[in-house]
Amino acid sequence: MTRIALITGAADGIGWAMAQRFAAAGCRVALADLDGDRAAARAVELGAPHLALRADVADEASVVAMIDETVARMAGLDILVNNAGIGDSHKPTLEQDLATFDRILRVHLDGTFVASREAARAMATRGGAILNVSSIAGLTGLPRRNAYGAAKAGIAAMTKSMACEWAGVGIRVNAIAPGYVGTALVAKLVETGRIDQARLERRIPLGRFADPAEIAEAAWFLCSPAASYVTGAVLSVDGGWSAFGDAGDASG
C-alpha cells in the first residue's frame, strides 16, 4: 500500500532529508514549508507524484488548510511529520523578550498541536502515524535555550498524551529528539561563532554531529510498519549526548 506522508519544514535540512527518505520508501510525500517556492522546487526534484504546499505552522488557519489540501489532493493521509521550527535567539536570559519567546512556542508547540489535531481527524477511520520532532534541548538543560527547550519539552509530553488518547483508533504518535545535526543552519551558527563545533563534538560520545540522513532514518523507522508496536516513545538520536553523565569530554 502506498502511504501518504505530510512533512512540515520539508524544503531544507532535516525535513528535506526526511522527504527524500520517505519517498525512497515508496510514500507519496506532501512537502510543506513557509517557503512555498523552495518546497515546490524540492517536489520537482523528487518527481511525480509528490506535492508542495506553502504553510505557516504558526497560523492555525494555514495549518488546517495544509491538512485539508493534502487529504483532498492525495486522497488521504497516513503519516504526519511535525518538523517545522525556528531557532532560539541564544541571548542571555536577561536580554530575552516575551514576543520572541511566544513566537518560538507558537511555531514549535502550537504548530505541532494544531497539525496533529487536524491529522488525527483525517486518520480517525484509517489509522496512521504522527512523528514529532523534539530535541536534546527538551530533555536536558542547554543554557539560554529557554523558549526552544520549553517548546521541545512540551512536544515530548504532548507526544505521550496523544499517543495514549489515539491508540484506540490506530494512530501511533512518537517523537525523535535529535542532538546537533550538520544542517546548513547549524553551519551558519558555527561560522558566526554562535556555537563551537569542536567543543560540542567532544561532548558527544560518538564524536561528531549527525548527518540529516541519519535523523531521517530514525524518523522513517518510527513511521514505518517496522515500528507497529511503538507509540508514545521519544527516541534520542543524539550520538549519546543525553546518555553521557561523566565529567569532561565524552570523546576525543
Regions found by a protein language model. Name each.
Residues M1-A30, M162:
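Canonical Rossmann dinucleotide-binding motif of NAD(H)/NADP(H)-dependent dehydrogenases/reductases
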Residues G36-D37, A55-A65, L98, A213-E214:
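The beta1-alpha1 cofactor-binding region of Rossmann-like NAD(H)/NADP(H)-dependent oxidoreductases
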Residues H90, T231-G252:
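Short C-terminal tail/terminal secondary-structure segment
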Residues K91-T93, D97-L105, L200:
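Substrate-binding pocket helix/loop in short-chain dehydrogenase/reductase
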Residues S116, A151, T159:
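Active-site helix of classical SDR
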Residues R121, C164-G168, S228:
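Alpha-helical segment proximal to the catalytic Tyr-Lys
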Residues S135:
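Residue(s) in the substrate-gating loop at a strand-loop-helix junction
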